[in-house]
Amino acid sequence: MIHPLAITMWDFSWIERRWDGAGFEDWNAALDGVKERGYDAVRIDAFPHLLSQAPEKEWLLLPVWYSNDWGSPYKVRVRLFPALIDFLKACRARRIKVALSSWFREDADNVRMALSTPQAMAKCWIDSLRLIADAGLMDTILYVDLCNEFPGDFWAPYFRNDPPWMTWSCWHTDAAMDYMRTAIALVRQEYPDLPYCFSFDGENTHFYRERDLSFFDLAEHHIWMTKLNKQQFYHEVGQAKDGRFTEEAYHLLADHALDVYHGKEKYWKQLLVDGIQTLAADAKVAGLPLATTECWGITDYKDFPMLPWGWVKDLCALGVETACQTGQWALMATSNFAAPQFCGMWRDVAWHQRLTAMIHKATLPPEAEKTSLGRAMRWE
């Protein structure tokens, strides 16, 4: 009998943040930290659009933001092959499963814009999976999320929805559904044993009931208290003039977040509980086991003056406890920040161990056993 797995998100940081002190300069040490804290899996960006184009090329990546601590805050050069293979080998040596996703990071030539068709999307993933298969490492792969938070325009600028203004959380349109269905079908033809999905975020989880996602093997959905009720928490903290992914946004958090949170703490906690329970109920109707690798309290945070971790850890613990009680999650993270670059979160080993133990004791959704996900969660 398998149990739900504890997973952490290492996004594109696993290869972008390799300068001294950035957290991933020593993969062996970082992965030993994963095992020590009780995690079973990591979710990373496989950069399939670049691997497919030229596996051994040194790519110049442009920063997606300067304020957050995911990825590099400045342009950075990476060589993905054989780096991905080396990373997967290090994971397998520790019996750590790897979920593959992509944020489709922008390089100097903006190669990602060629993925406007599902056929192009499928090809880049097939080419990338072939490299992994040729290395004999397919047993390490937990699932493939073809695009992070599709069709958000940060990560899927190549996709034109119908209507075009429908980007974040708007996966339910006919155009988006057709794109996802076709891309997954083509990849599945080549690699039928892997679980597949596109990951989503947003409050419109009722579409799990209304749209046919039977071509998914799991629903990876990202949920945070701060984005519920139309991002009420962020509105009360204050909106940065130049957007959320900025230093101004962190200044507003430092000045106001604790007061806003503690001013009606019970309300914010109940908002999170209600959101998790609603998501679980909607996924159950869809017949899909849930995976959540980005969650539960606040979306953007880091080690910063006047930004303590205590309230974030409290909310995340509540999120894990609530999700475990639903019995709908097969894969569960503890936060957005279970990674070595977030020192204030990562160094609390006992906190991670307590939450990963809670995840391991939860009930596995029966839907997981009915798909390839249940098989991928096991080590032979």
Model-found features: residue ranges?
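Boundary/entry segment of secreted carbohydrate-active catalytic domains
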Residues: 1-26, 34, 45-47
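Structural preference for beta-strand elements that scaffold enzyme active sites
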Residues: 2-6, 41-43, 95-99, 139-145, ...
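The substrate-binding groove and active-site-proximal loops of carbohydrate-active enzymes
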Residues: 10-24, 62-81, 108-123, 149-150, ...
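Aromatic-lined substrate-binding rim segments of carbohydrate-active enzymes
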Residues: 23-107, 119, 130, 169-197, ...
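Aromatic- and acidic-residue-enriched segments that line the glycan-binding/catalytic groove
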Residues: 54-68, 108-130, 156-165, 213-224, ...
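Aromatic-rich peripheral "rim/lid" segments of glycoside hydrolase catalytic domains that contact
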Residues: 59-66, 302-380
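Active-site groove signature of glycoside hydrolases
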Residues: 99-112, 126-171
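Extracellular glycoside hydrolase catalytic/binding regions
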Residues: 136, 151, 155-325
